Amino acid sequence: MNAEMAGRRAIKMVSEVVNFTVLLVVVLLLAYAFYSLWDSQQIYQAAEKSNYAIYKPTVENEGKTFKELQAINPEVIAWLSVYGTNIDYPLTQGQDNMKYVNTNAEGLYSLSGSIFLDYRNNKDFTDFNSIIYGHNMDKKAMFGEIDSFSDRRIFDTHQYGNLYFDGTDHSIEFFAFVHTDAYNSEILTPNVREEERQRYLDNLLAAATHKRAVNISTDDHIVLLVSCSSRSTNGRNILVGKVTDEINRVLSAQTDCIIVDQFSSNNENGSIMPIFLWHILLKLILALIITIRIYTIYHKQN
């Protein structure tokens, strides 16, 4: 009898240890899930264009607030806007192409990084082709809307932008959208030499998914807005525009872009839900199932 009772106590003790361990796992899963939500929210908040709105150069402030940002970080060289989108950010340039991958425009560490000009380009945009990079982020942050230009409707209704540098506004007229590989040196090489410009331009237009008729020559200056693609690991989406001294403040009538993030997947209705949120949701469901199981076992034993 004593042996039987001792056996039961041992089984109960083991069961309690198992239950406690499972409960601990549940708590850790919940803690991780909520931390992931908080952390991702912090990243997206840091990337919002509203964080830099006070620095945006305008006719009214004569660029004084922009100069204040340059005083904070001298590597801020310009301001880029794509009309009808949330792309409205200061533009930086480092001594390499790595610094501003995880540094914001104020020079502080940030996973959302900055929009930045290739270090091999001249900051006065006198090169034939200047390459500008930005993260493909959810919630229309940074270059999160470049991906949406693969939709012909979006491309057709978002034709203009603005590039402010050297104290002056310059118009951008977008004329091509290209999807290519990250290692395509025929397109992703900045500051092409004069004798190679026509071939470069021909290759660019031949690779374009969408394009419109714009007078463009080897004497012009073009910018390539480059971001990661949601379609492939090494894919790059590129919005190409011609920089002119003519100021065109025409806003696109279409402002509701269909955003596809590099970390997103489509459901049956075509809506977007980031994969990391699915992971968190599954962890929460698993934690709930385990908690119910522990509760059931505990009450059966008592």
PLM regions: where:
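Intrinsically disordered, low-complexity regulatory regions
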Residues: 10-13, 43, 290
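Juxtamembrane/start-of-transmembrane alpha-helix segments at the extracytoplasmic/lumenal side
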Residues: 18, 257-284
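N-terminal hydrophobic alpha-helix used for membrane targeting or insertion
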Residues: 5-8, 124, 272
